[in-house]
């Protein structure tokens, strides 16, 4: 029954590629074991009946007891290995199992008890959780049943024991001579070599299948179903070979069958990983790993995992075969020489032993020769390995020497860079010293300039004190001028009364004369009186102007005091203009018919100004704004411009009028701002006195420069 479960069905269970017939075989085997307990109900469905864990507990108790019963009937000499197997303590009843579980938690507790028992007995089985069995996962349930059947083997133990019992008498009469032992060892060695070559052929066939799989992947109509079919086909070939070795009846393979079963179970453990990967990918199609199954990807997760597992399995088999060869060689040496190869000492080897059959001696000599050849091959392999290691060490040495040379070159480059950096550092230090010296020199010059500036400040304060004194004197003069103007107004009033009386007398006289002869005499002496009266005021103004001119000449050409003097002169002129305006308003208020003596005197006073006198300076005079032209001029002695008013309209002002307004001594050049149709805004120079001065936006802008050329 166990062979029915294991032959051809191990990988089917692991891959979940089982059919209904296989399920019925599992159900029949479980029911066959449960018949030993009539009180237990047979199983109908593995998914439903084994979920609670009760049937599993009964099954463990039954198959364990059967295994103990079968072990008792096995011959002690022939079945020594079976008597020392891991299920020796089986057959005991599981404690803590609920025979009638009422809820999900009790079912899970029963299954956990079963899994704990399986783990405690070290029964080979892939990782399975209690949750999977309680939920009715058929794959997990069949794994557990298969593990119990493979471990306890209640049906196959009798067959093996019977076969051994029948063959025991025959084998007991066989002579255990050295020749037979040597032949057995040689046969075992041949079997090992055959197993190694067979595993190599399996790898070769697997690589051929991989090549065909790559061709299918390149096919545009490749699908996941084709890949799964290819994967199932790859795993059937090693399972069939392993199962054939399991069912081999040869007595030579009896000791080797357990190791092959173990290898088959290890293969099952290896295969279980991709099968669970298939289940997870089918349950979760949206997971990231499911995208690796798409036909567009070149290397799939399944192919890579299976290839790695097969290569690891091949390496593991090769290691085991090498160890088996070493053990068999040591056994052969022990049988032939009486000691292991590592325990041998230098002693003469006798080719012929007395009292031994020559054929047996020939067999022994051939066995020794084979052993020597094997040892020679091993020594050659070790020699090649040592040579390869020596080559690797030599390559490492050359690489280290090359690296050391590169590091020496790098160190030299770093030293050169360090030397250049030190040279740059010294150069920067020298530059820093030069800059510090220049900074000290600049600081010394700055101190000298500060001293000179202090001296200039003191001189400026002295000049400012002098200017304040002059302004004080000027204010005193202005006060005196106001007093004089007040006296002048009083005298004008008296003069007006006198003139009025005189006019009345002249009128009376003329009326009398007209009555005489009809001739009117002209009025004389009025203009002379006004001129005589205005003479002292004109002389005072000329005196102030001369004093300011002499004060201006006492300063240098670019001294800022020129601006103060010009402002003073402009203030005096503005004051005179205001006096003139006041007199004009008074004359208009009197409204005397005809030209009054005061108007005549005022006109004569204006006409009495010298030709080079400064016209009144005003910036805001509403009386003369309509008939006057503003003139803004710059000089080379002051940065501040000056402004004067010329009592003429724009376009009628000549250079002579401008010269009379600014009142500058010496030779000068006159430039005026003008608009040229071709060049735009320009400076136009005027030479002749009768030439008209160009204007700019309703005013005149001029630059007055001293002419140092010789006449």
Curated annotation (Swiss-Prot):
Residue ranges occupied by any Calponin-homology (CH) domain in the UniProt entry: 20-153
Disulfide bonds: none
Residue numbers spanned by region Disordered: 233-258, 271-298, 584-623
GO biological process: canonical Wnt signaling pathway; cell proliferation in forebrain; cerebral cortex cell migration; cerebral cortex radially oriented cell migration; forebrain ventricular zone progenitor cell division; modification of postsynaptic actin cytoskeleton; negative regulation of neuron differentiation; positive regulation of Wnt signaling pathway
Ranges of compositional bias, category Low complexity: 237-254
Primary residence: other
SUPFAM superfamilies: Calponin-homology domain, CH-domain (SSF47576), Ubiquitin-like (SSF54236)
Amino acid composition bias (Basic and acidic residues), ranges on this chain: 278-295
Ranges in coiled-coil conformation: 279-452
Modified residues annotated as Phosphoserine in this record: 212, 257, 618
Domain DIX: 600-680
Bias type Polar residues, positions: 597-623
Modifications after synthesis and translation: Phosphorylated on tyrosine and serine residues.
Molecular function as annotated in GO: actin binding; gamma-tubulin binding; protein domain specific binding
Cross-referenced Gene3D superfamilies: 2.40.240.130, Calponin-like domain (1.10.418.10)
PANTHER family (UniProt xref): DIXIN, SEGMENT POLARITY PROTEIN DISHEVELLED
Swiss-Prot/TrEMBL domain comment: The coiled-coil domain mediates interaction with MAP3K4 and inhibition of AXIN1-mediated JNK activation through MAP3K4.
Protein's job: Positive effector of the Wnt signaling pathway; activates WNT3A signaling via DVL2. Regulates JNK activation by AXIN1 and DVL2.
Name the UniProt record assigns to this protein: Dixin
